[in-house]
Amino acid sequence: MKNLTSNVTVESLTKRTLFHLKYSRGKTLITSTKLDKMMAFSHAIRDLAIDGFINTQSSYLNDNPRRVNYLSMEYLIGKMLENNIYALGVEKESRETLKNLDTSLDEVLQFDVEAGLGNGGLGRLASCYLDSLASLELPAYGYGIRYEHGIFKQEFENGWQREKPDEWLSHGYPWEMIRPEYTIPICVYGHINESHSSEKECPGTWSGYQIFEAVPYDVPVSYTHLRAHETRG
């Protein structure tokens, strides 16, 4: 996505953040917590990214180019708030804005959750591919799975290692946009019933399957775009 943030000022970014603090979180500056401020500020930064996202989508519709669709089981996209601040070139404005909200960028970034969409080299490589495609201005989408619990966490209890789910969605994730209108059915399990005739072999039929709903979520990222699917039984 192209950078459309040349006109961003501390005043406009502060106004956006206070708007989301009130209408997205239902809080005032006095009643808000640091988590509220992080979420509201993330929405404000996401607004800037969405401006570029919509501009990119419009160019796709007008030009109708051939597109690259990249499928990966993992994406290690990192912490989105920090990534977008630097990618959009609004670090200075962000620091001043958060000072106006009685906090700091360093404090807010402590609440920035890393998406549990992948881990290790495979996920990092997939994200790097998307960044490279976007930097070359090639129309590309990344498709993956929206893991509800992400990568497990390891803790020690009485000298024993315990694995627990990574509840990365417990407080919500401000960077994703659900697209229920594009939900599609996915069939899994079951078995194939073979069918034969005297003249030719007929295709088998699939029975005993279970249907899940694949619900897409879009995550606009500066200079790239990711679509992950959540399955619902």
What residue spans do the PLM features occupy?
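Beta-sheet entry/capping signal
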Residues: 67-69, 131-132, 137-142
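Residues forming anionic-ligand binding surfaces in small-molecule and nucleic-acid pockets
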Residues: 95-114
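Extended, charge-enriched "interface" segments that sit outside catalytic cores
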Residues: 2-63, 67-71, 76, 81-85
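N-terminal catalytic cores of NTP/NDP-binding nucleotidyl/phosphoryl-transfer enzymes
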Residues: 80, 116-120
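Extended, regular secondary-structure scaffolds
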Residues: 119, 136-220
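Conserved small/polar residues in nucleotide/adenosyl-binding loops
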Residues: 224-231
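A conserved hydrophobic secondary-structure block that centers on an alpha-helix together
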Residues: 123, 128-131
